[in-house]
Amino acid sequence: MDPSWATQESEAVAEKVLRYRRDASGWKKCREGNGVSISWRPSEEFPGNLYRGEGILCGTPEEVWDCIKPVASGLREKWDDNVSSFEIVQSITDMLCVSRTSTPSAAMKLISPRDFVDLVLVKKYEDGTISSNATHVEHPLCPPKPGFVRGFNHPCGCFCEPLPGDPNKTNLVTFFQTDLSGYLPQSVVDSFFPRSMAEFYPNLQKAVRKFHH
């Protein structure tokens, strides 16, 4: 993959995801509980929804980030049941790569195993926020794989934000807009994302405690 194209494309995605973070309009709450709020609005990228999750975790932004950062043999595979494997297909810079993520079947096997090939950019902001920003790409080393339906992540990502006044806590804001493809009933998709995003937060909290405390 051409590094200059990848750099340009990933920066455009990061701008878009930052815009989602700053734009408070049009979100409809669909799930709330245990300090986690999930909301959605129609996606501008595909005929589906953009989902937003927000919750406060015990742990510094670095500790939270360590459990979710996109690296080969990272912690994410160890604790996240929604990720069966994660590999780096091409490392472009320290902060930019192409990854392939495999996910197991879900929703009582209504959703069969998926794989996703993404361009992923990590950004660090002056206030201490660490973000990941991703979108789907095609890559010659990632042809369709038997046994997996290829899904497509439209611009998505997360922000590990320092909590003012409490250096040991992190405000985690996540954005998903994923085309699972493969002829799924819309009702299955609409119920799956809010639920899996809501479960992600307590599972991540357990991982932060396990690996960092």
From Swiss-Prot:
Tissue: Expressed in most tissues, with highest levels in liver and in kidney.
Keyword Isomerase: no
Domain START: 1-213
GO biological process: cholesterol import
MF term (GO), any: cholesterol binding
Keyword tags: Lipid transport, Lipid-binding, Transport
Domain of life the protein comes from: Eukaryota
InterPro entries recorded: StAR-like (IPR000799), StARD5/6 (IPR043556), START-like_dom_sf (IPR023393), START_lipid-bd_dom (IPR002913)
Protein role: May be involved in the intracellular transport of sterols or other lipids. May bind cholesterol or other sterols.
Name used for this protein in its record: StAR-related lipid transfer protein 5
